[in-house]
Amino acid sequence: MQPTSPAAPHRRLYTEEQRARRDATRWTLVQGILAPLQFLVFAISLGLVLWYLATGEGYAAATASILIKTFLLYTIMVTGAIWEKVVFGQYLFAPAFFWEDVFSFGVIALHTAYLWALFTGQPHGLQMGIALAAYATYVINAGQFLWKLRMARLDMEAAQ
C-alpha cells in the first residue's frame, strides 16, 4: 500500500483585502456587464460569419459584427486591466489571473490579425477564417474566466 500525501492546501483566489476591493470597485460591475454583452455579440457574430461562409451572403453584416466584437474585446481588456490594478495592485498578470491574461493576449492578437486582414483587403475567406480562429480562442478564454468565477464562488461558500 502506497502512503498518501496530504492534499495541497487550497489556495484562495482572493485575500480578504482583495475581495473587499473587488466588491467595492465599480469596475467589477463594468466587467459584469461587458462580459455577457461581449458573449451575446460573439454568438450573433458567429452566426453571421457562419452564414456568410455557408451562403456567400451577408459579408457586410458579418464584418460589422466582428468589428463590434473586437471593439468590445479591446474595451473589456482595458477595463479588466484597471480592475486588476484596483483589486490586485497591478494592471495585468496578477498571479490569480496570470494564465487568463496570457491567453487573452492570444485572443487579442487574433482579433487584431483580423483587423489587419480586413484593412489590407485580404480575401474574405481568409478574414473569416481568422475571425473563427479568434472566436475559438475567445471561447477558451471565456471558459477560463468562468472557471475562476466558479472558484471565487466556492471560496465564498467555504468562508461562510
Swiss-Prot record:
Pathway: Porphyrin-containing compound metabolism; bacteriochlorophyll biosynthesis (light-independent). One of its GO terms (molecular function) is hydro-lyase activity. It comes from Cereibacter sphaeroides (strain ATCC 17023 / DSM 158 / JCM 6121 / CCUG 31486 / LMG 2827 / NBRC 12203 / NCIMB 8253 / ATH 2.4.1.) (Rhodobacter sphaeroides). Its EC number is 4.2.1.-. Keywords: Bacteriochlorophyll biosynthesis, Chlorophyll biosynthesis, Lyase, Photosynthesis. GO terms for biological process: light-independent bacteriochlorophyll biosynthetic process; photosynthesis, dark reaction. InterPro entries: BCHF. It comes from the Bacteria. This is 2-vinyl bacteriochlorophyllide hydratase. It is an enzyme of class 4 (lyase). It holds the Pfam family BCHF.
